[in-house]
Amino acid sequence: STPYFKELERQYGFFRVYETGWPKADTYFSPETQLRPRNDRPVILYPPTFTRNVCSAPHLMKEIELLAKTKPWDWIITFHPKLTDPDIIAGYKRIAAENDNVTFFEGPDKMPLLQRADAMLCDSSSIILEFMFLDKPVVTFRNSHPGPHLIDVDRPEKVGPALERALSRPEELMREIRAYTMHHEPHRDCRCSARVLDAVDDYIARGHAGLKRKPLNLIRKWKLRRQMRYYPLLEMFRR
């Protein structure tokens, strides 16, 4: 995305663009994080999104329960804090309580789960990209933007065969995953956070030298003030 914003920088001239990379990605590309898991049995991570119209949790409950009983896999199920449907939560907690190979994880730190899992089952959650940063395959249920980097299915009964394929890590799929993640984050040196700080220091040191004056944008400012009901001058006169 940097070339696009660099062109805007050249066109408008009142701001600077720095290419830094995504600071959060530093965690995913450290040597310790990139280590492949050593599990006795395949581990499937299921972290569905909370967005109601694309959330797979209501549709896959029965299928996940069936797979937990019939496949030699271990499962880790974890929900976003905003997924609050009590029936869905109770249903998956019941599956975990009745099956020794299923864990229902409640906690904010998902990184250990991403590291431990061999494959992910998901829908359209943003965590998919983070998991693929670890060079691991993802099966999705009715993903909103499917592509060759995903194994996307549209019916619950297709989940099992799709996970078996994912666990085999076919070379074509892994190539697509690597190309996709490289497009989204080419910086793999774990210095994205440092580049952000360097950019801030550089801007402070250079100040506004060489930049044009920012347009007043009075109409936009008025719309924002009206939207936020922010009228400091009127408040002064009222006093």
Question: Which residue ranges define each predicted feature?
Answer:
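Active-site-proximal region of nucleotide-activated glycan assembly enzymes
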Residues: 1-26
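A short helix->loop->beta-strand "cap" motif at the edges of active sites that frequently abuts
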Residues: 13-15, 72-73, 135-137
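Short, conserved active-site loop motifs that form the nucleotide-linked donor/cofactor pocket
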Residues: 17, 101-103, 150-151
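Conserved catalytic-core segment of nucleotide-activated headgroup transferases in glycan assembly
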Residues: 18-93, 153, 188, 192-194
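Nucleotide-activated donor-binding/catalytic signature segment of Leloir-type glycosyltransferases, i.e.
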Residues: 89-106
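A donor-sugar binding/catalytic signature common to diverse glycosyltransferases
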Residues: 107-150
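C-terminal amphipathic helix plus adjacent low-complexity
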Residues: 161, 167-239
